[in-house]
Swiss-Prot record:
PANTHER family: NADH-UBIQUINONE OXIDOREDUCTASE CHAIN 5 (PTHR42829:SF2). It comes from the Eukaryota. The keyword Transmembrane helix applies. Its main location: mitochondrion. Pfam families: Proton_antipo_M, Proton_antipo_N. Core subunit of the mitochondrial membrane respiratory chain NADH dehydrogenase (Complex I) that is believed to belong to the minimal assembly required for catalysis. Complex I functions in the transfer of electrons from NADH to the respiratory chain. The immediate electron acceptor for the enzyme is believed to be ubiquinone. Keywords: Electron transport, Membrane, Mitochondrion, Mitochondrion inner membrane, NAD, Respiratory chain, Translocase, Transmembrane, Transmembrane helix, Transport, Ubiquinone. GO terms for molecular function: NADH dehydrogenase (ubiquinone) activity. It catalyses: a ubiquinone + NADH + 5 H(+)(in) = a ubiquinol + NAD(+) + 4 H(+)(out). This is NADH-ubiquinone oxidoreductase chain 5. It is found in: Mitochondrion inner membrane. Its EC number is 7.1.1.2. InterPro entries: NADHpl_OxRdtase_5_subgr (IPR018393), ND/Mrp_TM (IPR001750), NU5C-like (IPR003945), Proton_antipo_N (IPR001516).
Amino acid sequence: MILFITLPLLNVIISGLLSRYIGVNNIKRLNIINLFIILILLIYYYINIIKTDNEYTLKIIEWINIEYLNINYSFNLDLLSITMLIPIILISLIVNIFAWEYMKDDSHNPRFYTYLALFTLFMIILVLGDNYLILFLGWEYIGIASFLLIGFWYNNIDNIKSSLNALFINKIGDIFFIIALIYLIYIYKSLNYSLIFSLVSYINIDINNIIILCLVIAASAKSAQFGLHNWLIWAMAGPTPVSVLLHAATLVIAGIYLLMRSSPILENCPNILLFNLWLGAITSLISGLIAINSNDIKRIIALSTMSQLGIMFISIGLSSYNLTLYHVLCHSLYKALLFICAGTIIHSLNNELQDIRFMGGLLIYMPITYICMLIGSLSLMGLPSLTGYYSKDIIIESSIGIFTISGLIIYWLVVLSSLLTNIYILKLIYYSFINIPQLNKYIYNSLSLNNTYSLPFNFKFNFDKSWMAIICMIILSIGSLFIGYLLQDIYLGQGNSINGLFIYPNNLNLIETHFAINIYYKWIPIFNIFISILLIIYLYEFNYKLLYIYNNPLFYNFYILFNTRFLFDQILNNYIIRYTLYLSKSLNSLLDKGFLYTLGPNGLNYLLNLLSFNIIKFNTHLFNHYLIYISFSLLLFIYLQFDL
């Protein structure tokens, strides 16, 4: 188990300090080999934990021991943490393979691989930590690593702005996380999971509400929920491997993991569960409305991530943490697949174009990418028998299974969100691969020269040139096809308990979802898929003029509202970030460079000079003055010595 920490740490040290001596390619090989070793060990532990229902604990040192507060630097491996680790390590491995070719022409590869290794290391620490302090340590460092990765190409001002945006919004969540830690220390006198969770039912519900609300806000910032979601959209400024790493299965699920790990506290706070339910539904719907009016290929996929994160919040609000964990695992596979396909397209177009309206006709030149993109998209849509169907549809159905008015409204909101998801992901495929070619003819000539291979008898065929990307896409495509079916009994099977999760028996609604709800509610998400396919074919092939409805003043205003992302960027930049930066500058000038500087360095320097100048005045070179000084000193010594 110690290898889960030491091997990524070795990657960080060697990539950061020794790359100039052993070469960049050797750094890449070492990172891939170490991650592959960790993945093999994880699969071994995963099978063992499923068979025996064991947990593994590793205590390294005693970290803090102050009066009643005792915190160890220790790690715990249970079914919750290992299920989170598998997509983290798998996607990190895929990203390292994909980046080998994608970033081969970049002159700062050692720095890039150092950041990747740093991010992976602290994601592992976050998930394996045995207390909230270690979780917070990993939480902070993945925020720093994501800031460095998003702003990796720092010569572009947009990248710097995007990385700062991500940093500022995540710091809002970090502040609330710190408040929650202070409350936990004050109320529970500990930060250890086992002690807190054993006492939670004896603590006043209002106090628990405050603690878990702070944790929910922290999770909302990290997992891009409505109101704190802006950074996710702008994080696309980084290299595509960074987008895969951050938005598929790592950074954005840190908040989801925090809430799943805190499930014993959440279960004692029904009002916060209801808040999570509505927050997830609104996030899912808002992301769909924004994405359907977006045309950037990476931004559309990022918004689909935001939508799926909203669905995960819904499942948390339903107390269906096993469904949340299952969806995290399944979603990471097809979302990473979509991002890698998008990166392959952008890379093939010489990194010059991300607007899908100016693509088209790529099916002929990139058939493997098209097939893999189609698999990932259909899995995202929830086509029966694919991975996304098994994890996504059961969450949508579970909102009906609680048999409340809120559940019914949430169900229809998520159904509408799913319809929007289906439409914009099909729109992406149509514009990129099927539409009439819109690119410059020289780009198509370049694609034809690079992607055409000859066979005997003058037979030629087109094939994707990027072999590294093809390997990654095939691996993820297999996962997107079969993992959902293969693992459903582990997470959805009756009687299976997941170590690390706690659900009140009254909140178990999976049986009602399976057997009590009307069959029509189960079929509606599937009908959504066929409705969206027919709608896309009708609009883009037979009645394109219908899209001119945007020229209508009413619809145009809605289009502007959705296209400007509900003006959240303007509100955030003009009224929050700008005034926050102004306040920090004022406080820096008033306190740090003003009051404290005057009392500190300047004040101390002035006081010492004044004191030394006055002491010099006693040096009169007169014997009687020296005799008085000696006599006074002797009397003072006698007084202090004998306590007169």
